[in-house]
Amino acid sequence: MTRTVWIAAGAVAIATIAAAAGVGWYLRRSGRRALLRFRARVDRFKLASRKSVRERLLNDSAIGDAVRAHAASTNITTEAVWKRVDEYVREIVPFFNVVAYYQVGYRIAGWLLSLFYKVTVDHEDPSDHDRLPRNSVVVYVMNHRSNADYVLVSYALAGRVAISYAVGEWARAFPLEHIFKAFGSYFVRRRYREPLYHAVLERYVQLITREGVTQGIFLEGGLTRDGRLKSPKIGLLDYVLGIARDPTYQPRMFLVPIAINYDRVLEDRSLLRELASREGRERPGRFAQMREVLHYLGWNAARLLARRWRRYGRAAVTVGRPVPLQPWFAANADLFMLPKPERLGRVQQLCDEVMARIGALVPVTPVPLACAAIQNLDRDFIPRAVLLERMEEMRNALLELNGRVIRHERDIEQTFDRARRMLHMRHILVAEGDGFVLLPRNRELVSYYANSIEHLLGPFAAAVRARDALPAMLGASPFASGKVI
């Protein structure tokens, strides 16, 4: 009997090992096939194990100095501080999975995006990216319109690179945390000021930057609540620039601006409620918000099953020319010898310039163009001919100023019809006679979408800005003047 049990146990063990080997072989083959199919650049360091990255961080001398300083200032033992550091490392460090990113993630992303949007990807000059050196350190910097941005940009660039994003705490919930980490993203506590945490985060960001991991940074540090571009945050980019203390990295570093816009942002009403709550208006409780989300999901599921589903218009991405950082480092040769406040001031200037480049690349989709015309006219009833004329005037002005107008060759009536369907669906605009009535309860949505392109509108910008129905944001946008650098 005992011999039979041992034979059975051995057979199970051999079968388990064989199955594990087979699964491993299948995953490796799937990963290789995915890379060959997309011909994307996947940084070697991205495939390093979490254990090896953790060991490098725990043996980092700068983190060791931060541990001793924290222990001295808080009267906590160094052992307890090291334990906290280990928790931070486990929280931050991802585990990239090629199969998850390309075989699973790409297909799901493509299906979801095609379900909700018609996706447009435009390159300022595609050949510039092909000419980047293989050992270049590339950081994609972008504006932040929606939480769908992560999926949209990853999908748009899947044939070129696999991006590691800095993701906020909102995604640290099952299963989002596991998904983002499998895709190589790392988590950031946006408003956490503890120096020890930032020492760990800085060293991790610099470690992956030195190793050539391609990163994506939302330069505004969070979603725009009023539709305008926000002033840039410098923290993560300052960490990235820190590797240039070694001058051999300076010629290899590039920033690539990316601009994003939508005909409909999925969470626009939630963002407007957050903006209103800052002005003292009551914000719905968690149960009310959950009820609204469930209603939204149920309503759209019913529309999908009834075959009455309609997409939410365009989701557009413009990829700009790579910006080499070597000239900037040459012009700021004393950067790393300056006191920290002065150094951060120089970094802020760089971020402002990059944000201006992003602003100039923002795609103009039909709904923002129509909303800008509606807000510019500022009427409760707008004759169709008047609205079309103003949209055409704005489009011509945008093209003269090198604006990225999506499908600008179309007749303006075709562009408006695409916007009108969405505005009707959102209960913003209702047809009446030979024109349209603007419904007052959704006037804020008009401003939200008009604000996304207001800075591009040249002679029309001042009137659009003056009729904004949204409360002024704390910390004015760098584009509030309407000027594009």
How would you name each of these model-derived features?
Residues 1-485:
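Membrane-interfacial terminal anchoring regions of lipid-handling membrane enzymes
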